[in-house]
C-alpha cells in the first residue's frame, strides 16, 4: 500500500527554509540493535548482517532563518516505509534556541540545545603514509611538504544551567595540498523521516535539497565517554520509553561507531521543504 500524506502547517516563516554554510557528512556502520532503539515500531530498519547505515551531519550555517548557528545531526540509520527508505535522526544538537524550537515543533526532530566549542591547531608535518595511497588520488595522503590543520569540535548538551559532554570531533584539513579544488558542484536530495516525539506525535517525512561543492575527505575522529551498560540501555529502550540519559548514551554509541566514508560540503545551500504527515504502510 502506498504511503498516504497530508501537508503540515508551519509557523516558522514560510517554507521552504534556506540554510547556507558548510558541512561534513560522515556515514558509519551502526549496530542494528542500537539504531532500533530510536526507530518507531511502525517502521522497518534497513539492515544487513546486524548493521545499518547511520553516522552524522555536522554543519555550520552562516545564513539561515535562525541566523548563524551550528548543528550536529546524529543519524541512527535507514528505515523503510514502502515505497521509500529514509534516514532517521537519533538526536539533533543546535546552539540556537530558535532552531531547536522549530526543529521540535514543526519538523518533529529530537532537537536539543547544545554548546559547540571549536579549536584549530597546526599538526606537525608527517611522512607520506603509504596506507593512504588511494586517498592520495584525491590529495588526501600525508606528506612532508604540506602541514595539516586540526579542528576539534567539542559538543556539549545544555539542559537549563547544566551541560553534558556528548563528544569531541577531530577534523583534519590540508587545504594547501588540494589547492583551491573543492570538488564538483552537485545537487542532491536527503529525504528523512521524523516525528513520534513528545513535541510532535505525528510521523513525518521531509526533504532536504542540497546544492554544494562536494569532495571525499578523511573521516573525522570521534571520541567520548560511553557507559559500559549501553547494550542494556539498547534492550530496554527497544521495549519502553527511556530516560534522557539513556538516549544520550545511545546517541554517543552511534557517533562512536565505525566510519566508512566522509564527504565535505562547501558553498552549501540547503532547501528544507515543509514536512508532511505519513501513515505507515500495512
Swiss-Prot record:
Disruption outcome: No visible phenotype under normal growth conditions, but mutant plants lack neoxanthin.
GO BP annotations listed: xanthophyll biosynthetic process
Origin species: Arabidopsis thaliana (Mouse-ear cress)
Origin: domain of life: Eukaryota
Biological classification of the source: Eukaryota, Viridiplantae, Streptophyta, Embryophyta, Tracheophyta
Described function: Required for neoxanthin biosynthesis. Probably not involved directly in the enzymatic conversion of violaxanthin to neoxanthin. Is necessary but not sufficient for neoxanthin synthesis.
Signal peptide start and end residues: none
The protein's name in its UniProt record: Protein NEOXANTHIN-DEFICIENT 1
